[in-house]
Regions:
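Helix-loop boundary and gating motifs at the non-cytosolic
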Residues: 5-62, 211-254
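Conserved MFS/SLC helix-loop-helix module at the cytosolic interface between two early adjacent transmembrane helices
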Residues: 66-101
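Helix-to-loop junctions at the C-terminal end of transmembrane segments
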Residues: 67-80, 164, 263-277, 358
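Structural signature of the two symmetry-related core transmembrane helices
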Residues: 83-97, 174-177, 277-291
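Cytoplasmic helix-loop-helix junction between adjacent transmembrane helices
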Residues: 112-151
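Intracellular juxtamembrane helix-capping segments at the cytosolic ends
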Residues: 120-133, 238, 314-327
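C-terminal transmembrane helical hairpin of 12-TM major facilitator-type secondary transporters
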Residues: 278-317
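A late C-terminal transmembrane helix in Major Facilitator Superfamily
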Residues: 331-363
């Protein structure tokens, strides 16, 4: 096990651009995480539609966001932050000023349109975080960003659910989306740098996709997909287990403990002196997810979830770190867009895959199926790396 030292965090956090990027990223992501759960509540309660209808809306918006990732990232590389973010702000302002107050079909259309022009939050934040520090602190900085994501994921949905129980969901949805618009305006004003010292500036000649959009990059992106398959599927399976043992009121507690494990794991990974391959971390995450299928009480599920959670943020961090080192700086926006789209796709696949397994084999089957996906992808990735190294040695 590599040695752990928190000195890299002290060095990284001396960077004002890094601190700025982390704060901006958190402010912009909070409304995104809050809106995901709030849209479901709004469709089911205020619009009086089914959970299926809510799922269709979520899936449509997810596909739109996944499609937008690479081309919005490419525009970031070509034109810079402000020229990409401004249209997103205007589209979001128009769409979400109307969407909370209309019927389901119009809401669906506006959500898809807003998704296609969504602020490329993850691509911008990750580029700004990478640009803010040197090569030696990159993994630590990305780990800090992963911790910020975990905090947003834990806090934002909880606040949104609470607000939806107190006020009308239409106005809560409107308020949260306008906060997102405000965060986008702040990002536009601050305009954090997306290139580090000595790297190609935005708008310079692009590297051909044939030089980087190849097997090594795609393999890392596939690992990112498998990671979110495991996480999204586990999310559904946790809910299923808690319902099965009649402990629905403690679902939030189990999810919070799971998220706490991820937060701690992310901090520890950033403190390591040497990186660990994303494929090994994915294998560990999948292996740690299997025991969650055996849990038959809240304590057992929370404990096993905490252990699995320790590898959640590190696995995602490792895929981002490896992907960013594979591609040239002048196409990093597009690369991070592709990485984000692969992760979004994994989330969209993991939930229904686990749901299908749960319907056929019970709550524990959800964990088993998504963990198996993680094991298979990790094994394929490790095999590909071994073959590549053997081939390189032979030549």
């Amino acid at each position: 096990m590599p040695a752990v030292s928190f000195a890299p965090y002290r060095r990284a956090l001396r960077s004002k651009p890094l601190r700025t990027a982390l704060v901006l990223g958190t402010l912009v992501r909070m409304p995104v995480f809050a809106s995901t759960v709030l849209l479901t509540i709004h469709v089911v309660s205020s619009l009086d539609r089914s959970y299926t209808a809510a799922g269709v809306l979520a899936a449509a918006a997810t596909v739109a966001i996944a499609v937008s990732g690479p081309w919005r990232g490419r525009l970031l590389d070509r034109y810079g932050l402000r020229r990409v973010v401004l249209p997103s702000i205007l589209v979001a302002l128009v769409c979400w000023s109307i969407a909370p107050f209309v019927d389901y079909l119009l809401l669906l259309g506006l959500a898809v349109l807003a998704g296609l022009f969504v602020i490329p939050t993850f691509s911008i934040t990750r580029q700004a975080v990478i640009a803010a520090v040197g090569e030696e602190e990159r993994r630590t900085a990305i780990s800090l960003d992963a911790v910020a994501v975990e905090l947003s994921f834990i806090v934002a949905p909880a606040v949104a659910v609470w607000a939806a129980t107190v006020w009308d969901t239409s106005w809560v949805l409107f308020t949260i989306q306008m906060l997102g618009v405000g965060a986008g305006i702040l990002m536009y004003v601050v305009d954090p740098p997306l290139r580090g010292e000595g790297e190609a500036v935005v708008g310079t000649a692009r590297a051909s996709s044939r030089t980087w959009f190849r097997l090594p990059f795609l393999a890392v992106c596939l690992a990112a997909t498998a990671t979110t398959v495991v996480l999204a599927g586990s999310d559904i399976a946790i809910i299923a287990v808690m319902r099965d043992i009649a402990a629905e009121g403690q679902i939030g507690l189990v999810l919070a403990v799971w998220g706490l494990g991820s937060l701690i794991g992310g901090l520890l990974y950033g403190a390591l002196h040497r990186p660990i391959s994303a494929f090994w971390l994915l294998a560990g995450l999948a292996a740690a997810t299997f025991p969650m299928a055996l849990a038959s009480s809240t304590v057992q599920l929370a404990a096993s979830g905490f252990v699995a959670g320790l590898l959640c943020a590190p696995t995602i961090t490792a895929t981002i770190d490896q992907a960013s080192r594979i591609v040239p700086a002048q196409v990093r926006g597009e690369a991070m867009g592709w990485h984000g789209s692969f992760m979004t796709t994994g989330g969209a696949v993991g939930a229904p895959l686990a749901g299908l397994a749960i319907d056929r084999g019970g709550p524990g089957a959800g964990f088993v199926v998504v963990a198996a996906v993680g094991v298979v992808v990790a094994a394929l990735g490790l095999t590909a790396v071994s073959v590549r190294r053997a081939t390189a040695s032979a030549t």
